[in-house]
Amino acid sequence: MNVYNKADSFSLESDSIKDVIHDYICWLSMTDETRPSIGNVFTAMETFKIDAVRYYDGNIYDLAKDINTMSFDSFIRSLQNITSKKDKLTVYGTMGLLSIVVDINKGRDVSNIKFAAGIIILMEYIFDDTDLSHLKIALYRRIQRCYPIDDDDDR
């Protein structure tokens, strides 16, 4: 899987935010030994954890612990529980929450497919095109803040 290269070449104009999120969730769920170096897109994705803590009205870590990753069915049921809290989490907070869930479950047998499928189901279920568009623009801005592109290099 060439996640690092794909993530570093993120383009606001052409890349699907769903593909970027899918790759990020797969990257998160890899073991530390197999995970490629973090790319600038994934560094920006990590900042959504701050949004999850900031905007959720309650302890986001308690909510993350309630998300059951032991089986695919229980994981999907847990995601449905998240959808009932959409107004409290926001699209950014939901992305951060899923990152926190992976952090909590590190070392357990959590498959890439489970998280990738779960996040895609979640996106189809509660995020509309406007939410995803806002997420894509926010991600792009966070990348630009950390890794500004100097247009003068071409001269």
Swiss-Prot record:
Keywords (A to Z) from UniProt: Early protein, Host-virus interaction, Inhibition of host innate immune response by virus, Inhibition of host interferon signaling pathway by virus, Inhibition of host TBK1 by virus, Inhibition of host TLR pathway by virus, Interferon antiviral system evasion, Viral immunoevasion
Alphabetical list of Pfam families matching this protein: Poxv_Bcl-2-like
Gene3D superfamilies the UniProt entry points to: dsDNA poxvirus
One annotated GO biological process: symbiont-mediated suppression of host type I interferon-mediated signaling pathway
InterPro entries, A to Z: Poxvirus_Bcl-2-like, Poxvirus_sf
Induction behaviour: Expressed in the early phase of the viral replicative cycle.
Cysteine disulfide links: none
Superkingdom of origin: Viruses
Job of this protein: Prevents establishment of cellular antiviral state by blocking virus-induced phosphorylation and activation of interferon regulatory factors 3/IRF3 and 7/IRF7, transcription factors critical for the induction of interferons alpha and beta. This blockage is produced through the inhibition of host TBK1, by binding host TBK1 adapter proteins TBKBP1 and AZI2, thereby producing a strong inhibition of the phosphorylation and activation of IRF3 and IRF7. Also acts as an inhibitor of the cellular response to type I IFN by interacting with host STAT2.
Protein family according to the UniProt entry: Belongs to the orthopoxvirus OPG029 family.
Subunit structure, as described in the record: Interacts with host TANK, TBKBP1 and AZI2; these interactions prevent interferon production. Interacts with host STAT2.
Name the UniProt record assigns to this protein: IFN signaling evasion protein OPG029
Organism, scientific name: Monkeypox virus
Gene behind the chain: OPG019
